[in-house]
Swiss-Prot record:
Cofactor(s) in the UniProt record: Zn(2+)
Family stated for the protein in its record: Belongs to the metallo-beta-lactamase superfamily.
N-terminal signal peptide: none
Top-level taxonomy: Bacteria, Pseudomonadati, Pseudomonadota, Alphaproteobacteria, Hyphomicrobiales
Keywords: Hydrolase, Metal-binding, Plasmid, Zinc
UniProt remark on cofactor binding: Binds 2 Zn(2+) ions per subunit.
Name of the protein in question: N-acyl homoserine lactonase AttM
UniProt xrefs under InterPro entries: AHLLactAttM, MBL_superfamily_lactonases, Metallo-B-lactamas, RibonucZ/Hydroxyglut_hydro
Residues binding Zn(2+) 1, per UniProt: 103, 105, 180, 202
Length: 263
């Protein structure tokens, strides 16, 4: 497969509370959010963006994630794992050239170390923070997901490497968007027919965050979170990009899912 395409996929969902996603809202009401990940096919080699939940949580969530399951409970089947879904699309895992990480929280690390020829691209400050997170953030990082010997890593350096062009042809560009995590990055995807799409990932969980009507329930920096949304809004307006928020149970169903695609 050499056509440039964007596939939108989902590795199950997370059961939580509204206030985990929208700060100080919901009065303790239950909430369930999708866990998206993305595949870009390209003649130079394919890219996985994030990979969703590690497949191990489909069979042993508490054994893999520990106490964070008391807050975020994964609902996932084994066939919703990243590798299984990529294979179901007829793609050989050996043909994946890049695994690109928005950040290293537990619901975004399902592709790391699972594609034998892949270079893993992440912000350096995110990688370093994931090993020594502050006390309030520790539950969000599952070290065994990313602390894997023998992986090829490529580190980006915040504003110095902002708008890094993965393929060199404008198809996939990183956008540094810290706040939710210290080294968070979003992605601008430009497609020949569908045009630009802006994957905010967790810089904006939902359209409430995007429209500045709520703060996310988890963040590393409030100021950085707000400023990153403003940066992404400006980019979307300038490029005319369609906006894809990170964990939005209302907006996510409106997008085409694999085996459908954007091209």
């Amino acid at each position: 497969m050499t056509d440039i395409r964007l596939y939108m996929l989902q590795s199950g969902s997370l059961k939580c509370k509204v206030h985990n996603i929208k700060m100080n809202q919901g009065n303790g009401a239950d909430y369930e959010i999708p866990v998206p990940f993305f595949l870009i096919t390209h003649p130079k080699g394919h890219t996985i963006i994030d990979g969703g939940n590690a497949v191990e949580v489909a069979t042993d969530p508490r054994g893999h994630w520990g106490g964070v399951c008391d807050v975020y409970w994964p609902v996932m089947r084994e066939d919703e794992g990243c590798v299984a879904q990529v294979k179901a699309l007829g793609i050989d895992p050996a043909d994946v050239k890049y695994v690109v990480q928005s950040h290293l929280h537990l619901d975004h690390t399902g592709a790391i170390g699972r594609f034998p020829n892949a270079t893993h691209i992440v912000q350096r400050r995110e990688y370093e923070y994931a090993f020594t997170p502050d006390w309030f953030a520790g539950g969000g990082y599952i070290r065994k997901d990313f602390d894997r010997p023998g992986l090829r890593w490529q580190f980006l350096n915040a504003d110095v490497d902002d708008y890094y062009d993965i393929y060199g042809d404008g198809t996939l560009t990183t956008v540094f968007s810290p706040g939710h995590a210290p080294g968070h990055q979003s992605f601008l995807v430009r497609l020949p027919k569908s045009g630009p799409l802006l994957l905010t990932i967790d810089a904006a969980y939902t359209l409430d965050h995007w429209n500045e009507q709520a703060l996310p329930g988890f963040l590393a920096s409030t100021v950085d979170t707000v400023r990153s949304v403003q940066k992404l809004r400006t980019l979307a307006e300038r490029t005319g990009a369609q906006v894809v928020t990170g964990h939005d149970p209302d907006a996510w169903p409106s997008f085409k899912k694999a085996p459908g695609y954007y091209d």
